From Swiss-Prot:
InterPro entries: Ribosomal_uS11 (IPR001971), Ribosomal_uS11_bac-type (IPR019981), Ribosomal_uS11_CS (IPR018102), Ribosomal_uS11_sf (IPR036967). It comes from Haemophilus influenzae (strain ATCC 51907 / DSM 11121 / KW20 / Rd). This is Small ribosomal subunit protein uS11. The gene is rpsK. GO terms for biological process: translation. NCBIfam families: PRK05309.1, uS11_bact.
Length: 129
């Protein structure tokens, strides 16, 4: 008995004009996520996933490469305007925004959403190196 060939459905690329760029910059890594206005993730990239390991993962250049990788993926969606949300104290904060600007996106506003405790949990002890 011959099997009928199963056709794969063509995925319809949704067109998104406005998006939100979430940058989570920690001391060890930088995570870049691009979402639409509703918060649905379109693309994401990390400094570690971009081929950087160890101490090189926490550099501004690694964050820039991650931002460029994410920008390439999102170009297919027709994204033009971006709102940037930056979280964390890491070294990749500014370089990711510069990489976005160089990729040709129009940045509408930049917001710092770093969580600041109102005297919550006790912070870790200071490092003695």
């Amino acid at each position: 008995m011959a099997k009928t060939p199963v056709r794969a459905r063509k995925r319809v690329k949704k067109q998104v004009v406005d998006g939100v760029r979430h940058i989570h910059a920690s001391f060890n890594n930088t995570i870049v996520t691009i979402t639409d206005r509703q918060g649905n993730a379109l693309a994401w990239a990390t400094a570690g996933g971009s081929g950087f390991r160890g101490s090189r993962k926490s550099t501004p250049f690694a964050a820039q490469v991650a931002a460029e990788r994410c920008a390439e993926i999102v170009k297919e969606f027709g994204l033009k305007n971006l709102e940037v949300m930056v979280k964390g104290p890491g070294p990749g904060r500014e370089s990711t925004i510069r990489a976005l600007n160089a990729a040709g996106f129009r940045i509408t506003n930049i917001t710092d959403v770093t969580p600041i405790p109102h005297n919550g949990c006790r912070p870790p002890k200071k490092r003695r190196v």
